[in-house]
Amino acid sequence: MMRTLITIHPLPLLLLLQQLLQPVQFQEVDTDFDFSEDKKEEFEEYLEQFFSTGPTRPPTKEKVKRRVLIEPGMPLNHIEYCNHEIMGKNVYYKHRCVAEHYFLLMQYDELQNICYNRFVPCKNGIRKCNRSKGLVEGVYCNLTEAFEIPACKYESFYRKGYVLITCAWQNELQKLIPHTINDLVEPSEHRSFLSEDGVFVIPP
């Protein structure tokens, strides 16, 4: 039977065999869907993280607004706040749960202005951070279960304190923009003081 097929239809069978023996090739994914700008950027970021093997893109203004800033709604002291918001905002790193995360109840312009405040030591004491001048309400999320999405489980902690952030220069905007939220330090735990030159210092 096989010999008969090869004799009668040699060319189609050879072409089919050639296609089957070719290595699998991934085609470029068309992302030109009818999305809003926020959703389009979020979808492109998802595809980049899924296919990329290198470092992720630096955060943009829209990414910071989407992942960090929150509006009044669910009570900030709700026990499930982090589990709800982290899933809703797709907060993860290369499909793995983030070890910790901060949500801040403030406007983006207020957060960006912190980039121009004085430097203070970061939480780990290694880098320099910028500190907010006033107290900010927010939620600290700490990973308690699982390492891969969507099984991430977090413990939620309401905080009202000083925000410590790192900032990065963005060429497109020609401005410093928030890069990471390093800590949200409550005054009662802060034991802060000003050094002789007026710089805010966090004791070890």
From Swiss-Prot:
Query: Molecular function terms in GO for this entry?
Result: nucleic acid binding
SMART domains given in the database record:
RNAse_Pc (SM00092)
Kindly state a single biological-process term from the GO annotations of this entry: defense response to Gram-positive bacterium
Compartments annotated for it: namely:
Secreted
Cystine pairings recorded for this chain: 97-152, 115-167, 122-129
* Subcellular location, principal: secreted
Supply the InterPro entries for this chain.
RNaseA, RNaseA-like_dom_sf, RNaseA_domain
Q: Which Pfam families match?
A: RnaseA
Q: Carbohydrate attachment sites? A: 130, 142
Give the record's keywords alphabetically.
Disulfide bond, Glycoprotein, Secreted, Signal
UniProt signal peptide: 1-26
Instruction: Please give the superkingdom of this protein's source.
Output: Eukaryota
Can you quote a single GO CC term? Answer: extracellular region
In UniProt terms, what function does this protein have?
Answer: Does not exhibit any ribonuclease activity.
Q: Which family does it belong to?
A: Belongs to the pancreatic ribonuclease family.
Name of the protein this chain belongs to = Inactive ribonuclease-like protein 9
Kindly list the organism's lineage.
Eukaryota, Metazoa, Chordata, Craniata, Vertebrata
